[in-house]
Amino acid sequence: MAESEEYARVISFNNDHDELIIYQETVTDVGGVIWDSALMTIHYFFKYPKPFEGKKVLELGSGTGVGGIALAALGADVIITDLPERLALIEKNVEANRKLTGNRIKVQVLDWTKDRIPEGLDMVLAIDCVYYNSTIDPLITLLNDCDAKEIMVVSEERDIGEAHLAQKSFFKDIQKFFRLELIPQKELDEDYCADDIIIGKLIRNV
């Protein structure tokens, strides 16, 4: 793989909120760029900013950190997590947005195969976390074992390859423990919505 360089993307919103600055990698795996699913999610957050003030949130498999950074900019206390090789980019992006987020972000490793989500969270956020079959069971176990008040999952439909099969398996197997409640498209930002991207909440089965 060629050596990667970084470039900044400025994300603006349709209101009075400040812009986010997010660095991406020119050569990367799935974690080094901002996917459309992440853009759709953060514009949804910024459309309804008040509910996030003071909330305790953890983002799984954050990649660039954009989801957690957006929530911290809206007043949430956020733990942004990923594997060790992804933390440098996340930390760079956290620092680039420090004036908006203050000290409301912690960045740390969370290995789905051996770590657990901390107790007492208001929300767990997972944006496009399902790409590989090997991660499905650990992710489902991780989510089922956590006591967060809300679990939000975002997924852009993949139509080929391992990512397609992994998504199908995840949403089938997660039904053992949760049902998926979709956010209606009318509630999303009208400029940032797509039929092949879902934003939903996992509601625990009773």
Swiss-Prot record:
Q: Which SUPFAM superfamilies does the record associate with it?
A: S-adenosyl-L-methionine-dependent methyltransferases (SSF53335)
GO biological process per UniProt: methylation
Q: Tell me, what is one Gene Ontology molecular-function annotation carried by this entry?
A: protein methyltransferase activity
The record's EC number reads: 2.1.1.-
InterPro entries per the record?
A: Methyltransf_16, SAM-dependent_MTases_sf
Q: Which PANTHER family match?
A: HEPATOCELLULAR CARCINOMA-ASSOCIATED ANTIGEN (PTHR14614), PROTEIN-LYSINE METHYLTRANSFERASE C42C1.13 (PTHR14614:SF132)
Family designation = Belongs to the methyltransferase superfamily. METTL21 family.
Q: What is this protein called?
A: Protein-lysine methyltransferase vkmt-1
* Name of the gene: vkmt-1
